Amino acid sequence: MNFTQYSDIKHFYMDTYDLLMRHEAQNVIPLGNIIIGNEGKDKTDWRDSANWFMATITDDKSILLTAVMTTPKNLTLYATDNKNDNIALNSLVDGIIKNDIHIPGVMAEKSLAEMFAQSYAVKRGIEYTVAKNQRIYELSQVNVEIPSIGTVRLATKKDMSFLPYWMKGFDSDCFGDSLATGGSTDNYLYRMSDNRLYILEDNGMPVSMAKISRDLQTVCVVGLVYTPPYFRGKGYATSCVAAVSQFGLDRGFTKCVLYTDLANPISNSIYMKIGYKPICDSIEIKFSED
């Protein structure tokens, strides 16, 4: 097995893009990241590829394992064609440790992430915990029976009177209160600057939001789904996500993709009613300091 660490995003992109595209919906995060890095237009925050860890494991014929970490975020992994190879995985772990790369966490298809975590934790002499069990869904057609409520429109700067609170609420729901207390006006404006954040209004009152967060070759990603607690249980999230998903399909994408937290059965049920179908389970694992 050969461990190759890359310093050039364009080289890494050329070697791995087609492999990741074999499971495009599953790989929306690493694919989206290497597209951002390859374009090089946006180097804010974690998007500067000069700070990334990028590696592949190959045998005599081909790449067996692809790894990319957009520091300081988690490591993401893809076993080519979802064929987990324990020797390849341990070669990656050995290469990471030899090169003194520190991994805060890993997020990947469940069985692969668990294999990596076990090997990495043992060899580092550290502990790990499961941060989130997730499911990846894709949709090719919106259920026409979903009721349409109110009006869905693009968010504007005028919405900054409430959007920071909604985004903090979203972060709190997804990542916990400890990671939802920060944030600046510039950060919130950035999250709506690409004109893909949508607001559902009912009788002129903003009640829910969702965003088309990434464009890939044939799929777009729906995320940042949030309804304030006061407005929950009224069908707003269902209507908003259905409308935004249809916007994505209308733009020419063949599928919409989203991640869900398996600890929230209500949201999983909502998405399946809209027409989303599960394609694989993903897990996020965090490591203790080593």
Residue ranges of model-derived segments:
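Conserved active-site alpha-helix within GNAT-family acetyltransferase domains
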Residues: L112-V130, T238, A263-C280
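Conserved donor-binding loop and adjoining core beta-sheet/short helix segment
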Residues: T4-S7, D18, E24, G32-N99, ...
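Conserved beta-strand-loop-alpha-helix junction that forms the acyl-donor binding cleft
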Residues: M107-A113, L258-N268, I285-D290
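A conserved beta-strand-loop-helix scaffold within acyl/acetyltransferase catalytic domains
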Residues: I35, M69-P72, L179-Y226
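Short amphipathic alpha-helix that is part of the acyltransferase structural core
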Residues: M1-L31, V142-D177
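Conserved acetyl-CoA-binding loop-helix of GNAT-fold acetyltransferases
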Residues: N84-G95, T227-P229, G233-D250, S269-K273
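Conserved GNAT acetyl-CoA-binding A-motif
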Residues: D100-K110, G248-T260
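Acyl-donor-binding surface of acyltransferase catalytic domains
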Residues: I63, T70-I149, I285
